[in-house]
């Protein structure tokens, strides 16, 4: 019986180690003492679609980088462009990203439209991208953190909204994007 139990425990530990090795590119962290929030003051953002001038709270992709949760990027209200939608952040220098934090457009009651599922990608030339993961996006006003690999530094971060919360919605929007990096 003891031998069977030891074999079972050894097998369980081995399986856990193998599973962990296959997920080494995504590390969840609670203790942020080893990371820092990247300075985004010089970053720029472009998108496949933006709301034209004159609309409330800008609608431009640049609103994602202004540290103001009251402003937001919104796909064009006046033109119906179906999913996917994307925004590309030029971080100007390569960053060893640990986590990407994304905040939804703020509302008294969290907005129930917008993206439901999205992917993150990294690039050093803004053209060829490497997948950093695909994630669900919850309906909440709170910023949401998504772990990514720090093994390869990237200059560009692309967020692509893949699916809407409601099937009849073609628009998406976000308030802020922040990147947490390894401390230097």
Residue positions per predicted region:
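Aromatic, loop-rich ligand-recognition surfaces of beta-strand-rich domains
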Residues: 25, 54, 59, 66-131, ...
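Intrinsically disordered, low-complexity regions enriched in Ser/Pro/Gly/Gln/His and often acidic
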Residues: 34-37, 47-49, 64-66, 79, ...
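Bacterial Sec-dependent N-terminal signal peptides
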Residues: 3-5, 15-44, 49
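Cytochrome P450 fold signature focused on the C-terminal beta-domain
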Residues: 134-136
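Internal alpha-helical transmembrane segments of multi-pass membrane proteins, especially GPCRs
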Residues: 6-10
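Exposed alpha-helical structural elements
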Residues: 42, 59-60
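Short, Lys/Arg-enriched, disordered terminal segments
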Residues: 1-5, 183-184
